[in-house]
Amino acid sequence: MPDENKFPLIGEKFPEMTVETTHGSMKLPDQYKGRWFMLFSHPGDFTPVCTTEFYSFARRFEDFQKINTDLIGLSVDSTISHIEWVNWIRDNLKIEVPFPIIGDSMGRVATRLGMIQAESSTSTVRAVFIVDPNSTVRLIMYYPLEIGRNVDELLRAIKALQMSDKYRGAMPANWPYNELIGEKMLNPAPKNVKDATGRLKEFKGYAWWLTYKDVPDNEVQETKKIVKMREEK
């Protein structure tokens, strides 16, 4: 039996649970089987930073869809509060929030996922869980109350995970704009002396343990189009 008091870690299966959302009842992670999904919590409805975040997530929703990723929000507010808030966003900020938001007024889901603030039993931190099509947790992030999330970085991280899986490598800092190897990806470190000896003969690199290879250009261009920071007009 899974330990209900243990928070999920990177590399573990996302815990099974039934949640109530603004789009109805859902079973997680089965609802998103075969797709990536990003579950993110916010401290509360009708708050300044959270409202700017939801505006950004709604505005960039199609970019997440382009990389096979669904969004689902959460806070320890009721679904009624969520509905009123997204209606306010629609009416006043002129944008629809197209993704579901979990109503968790008892804090059951937030507690299970380790999202509750240390100094408060009634508010969630800005947590992010990125889950792959096999329902495995691939990335966990926590942001403090006073800082909103960077949507471009979340998109970049998801796309980088997808590229790592697809082409069996690792993605460098700031990919696809890395200062050393640009758009390329890193090879896994050799596992034995034989592999280490031949690594620089097979790939370009700075050392046998630091070599790189090309990523298909169409993948790079898709990533740049989606995650490039854009100045608002």
From Swiss-Prot:
Places the protein is found: Cytoplasm
Family to which this protein belongs: Belongs to the peroxiredoxin family. Prx6 subfamily.
GO molecular function, one term: thioredoxin peroxidase activity
PROSITE patterns tied to this protein: THIOREDOXIN_2
Upper taxonomic lineage: Archaea, Methanobacteriati, Thermoplasmatota, Thermoplasmata, Thermoplasmatales
Highest taxon listed in the record's lineage: Archaea
Record-level GO BP terms: cell redox homeostasis; cellular response to stress; hydrogen peroxide catabolic process; response to oxidative stress
Entries under CDD domains matching the protein: PRX_1cys
InterPro entries assigned: AhpC/TSA, Peroxiredoxin, Peroxiredoxin_AhpC-typ, Peroxiredoxin_C, Peroxiredoxin_TDXH, PRX_1cys, Thioredoxin-like_sf, Thioredoxin_domain
Record-linked HAMAP family: Peroxiredoxin
SUPFAM superfamilies: Thioredoxin-like (SSF52833)
Alphabetical keyword list: Antioxidant, Cytoplasm, Oxidoreductase, Peroxidase, Redox-active center
Limits of the Thioredoxin domain: 8-163
Chemical reaction(s) catalysed: a hydroperoxide + [thioredoxin]-dithiol = an alcohol + [thioredoxin]-disulfide + H2O
Other information: The active site is a conserved redox-active cysteine residue, the peroxidatic cysteine (C(P)), which makes the nucleophilic attack on the peroxide substrate. The peroxide oxidizes the C(P)-SH to cysteine sulfenic acid (C(P)-SOH), which then reacts with another cysteine residue, the resolving cysteine (C(R)), to form a disulfide bridge. The disulfide is subsequently reduced by an appropriate electron donor to complete the catalytic cycle. In this 1-Cys peroxiredoxin, no C(R) is present and C(P) instead forms a disulfide with a cysteine from another protein or with a small thiol molecule.
Function: Thiol-specific peroxidase that catalyzes the reduction of hydrogen peroxide and organic hydroperoxides to water and alcohols, respectively. Plays a role in cell protection against oxidative stress by detoxifying peroxides.
Subunit structure: Homodecamer. Pentamer of dimers that assemble into a ring structure.
GO cellular component terms, semicolon-separated: cytosol
Binding site residues for substrate: R126
Active site (UniProt): C50 (cysteine sulfenic acid (-soh) intermediate)
EC numbers: 1.11.1.24
Protein name: Peroxiredoxin 1
